[in-house]
A protein has these predicted regions:
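C-terminal closing repeat unit and adjoining cap/tail of repeat-based domains
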Residues: 286-311
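Outer-membrane beta-barrel "beta-signal"
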Residues: 181, 246, 321-335
Length: 335
């Protein structure tokens, strides 16, 4: 079954590439833009004396326009820890400048793409917030409006979804909803405020809300975010997570293999138990070696994580290496 899925993916992308190459200058539509991410890594846990190699992500995507105001997006994951997944399958209509309506499987407007997208993450491993709060995609309807207010770029998003996992369109008596408002853009200051109601089943109902702030300069960036997840079924399983991270890119000579070097540092924590101690926190140091002129793109990365535990969390203790100090060497290609 996986082989068939893989072959189908290559056939679809091959057909799109052939169609694109066959266009003439007078044919503007349909248009195609391809993107991809490949992440291979090695991990070593000194305390346990164990190590592993893995292909963490292998993504291929295509997006473009069918007509002047009609967009599409498709993306597949060839290997997410060995699993094939369809990630994005959506169409968008843009009847007015800045306004879009999207239907299909797409991202939920609650997480920041720079903490969930393998191609834009600052470290090999995601923040606690991005990894353990819930899925990042669902099937549904999303509307977004980009506008300027007082010369500040802003956007407002609202979506309703199946309140389920991706690639599983089930009948529901309750749908989930998410809303987000953003101030600024990815260069300079940017801040967002968001809420997400997720009534998955009688046993699982989460309500999330949070805010973030980031600043990106020419060759550096700093990001911070806090989010609460209320458990509407079990009050003793509420979660609160936070992170603060930053990186700086130093240019090297163009004739070097590595075009820049990027030190990075992150502190994050996640807390569930209602006491005066943080359950699990982590300090991560990273050093990236850029393969291209563009900072924070394709690179060879070396990270080391230190974990500090006051209470065991079940979802962070599924195997010994999960919450143990860890060395990671990762090769990331972004195209």
């Amino acid at each position: 079954m996986k082989i068939k899925q893989l072959l189908l993916s290559f056939m679809l992308f091959g057909y799109a590439a052939f169609s694109f190459s066959s266009e003439t200058d007078s044919t503007a539509y349909p248009s195609f833009k391809f993107d991809g991410t490949l992440k291979n890594k090695f991990e070593y846990v000194p305390e346990a004396g164990t190590s592993r190699f893995s292909v963490r992500n292998s993504r291929l995507g295509v997006s473009g326009k069918i007509f002047p105001m009609v967009d599409y997006r498709a993306q597949v994951e060839l290997s997410s820890e060995g699993k094939f997944q369809v990630l994005d399958l959506s169409g968008s209509i843009k009847p007015y400048e800045g306004l879009s309506f999207t239907l299909g499987q797409t991202s939920i407007p609650i997480y920041n793409s720079y903490t969930t997208n393998p191609g834009t993450m600052m470290f090999a491993n995601r923040t606690f917030l991005a990894k353990y709060y819930g899925g990042t995609r669902d099937i549904g309807f999303l509307t977004k409006y980009d506008f300027d207010a007082l010369q500040i770029p802003m956007s407002a998003e609202f979506g309703i979804f199946n309140s389920n996992v991706i690639n599983s369109p089930t009948w529901r008596d309750k749908l989930s909803y998410a809303a987000r408002i953003s101030f600024g853009d990815m260069k300079g200051f940017r801040s967002t405020f968001k809420v997400y109601d997720y009534p998955n089943s009688p046993e699982i109902h989460h309500f999330m809300y949070g805010a973030d702030l980031r600043y990106e300069g020419k060759n550096w960036k700093v990001e911070t975010e806090a989010m609460k997840r209320d458990d509407k079924v079990n009050n003793d399983k509420d979660l609160f997570a936070y992170y603060l991270q930053g990186a700086y890119s130093f240019k090297l000579k163009e004739n070097y293999l590595f075009k820049n070097i990027m030190p990075a540092v992150r502190y994050d924590f996640i807390d569930q138990i209602a006491d005066n101690k943080i359950d699990v926190s982590r300090l991560t140091f990273g050093l990236g070696f850029g393969l291209g002129k563009k900072a924070f793109s394709s690179l060879l990365r070396i990270d080391y994580e230190w974990y500090f535990k006051n209470n065991q969390l079940d979802f962070l203790n599924q195997y010994e290496e999960m919450d143990a100090d860890k060395l990671t060497v990762e090769l990331v290609y972004i195209f």
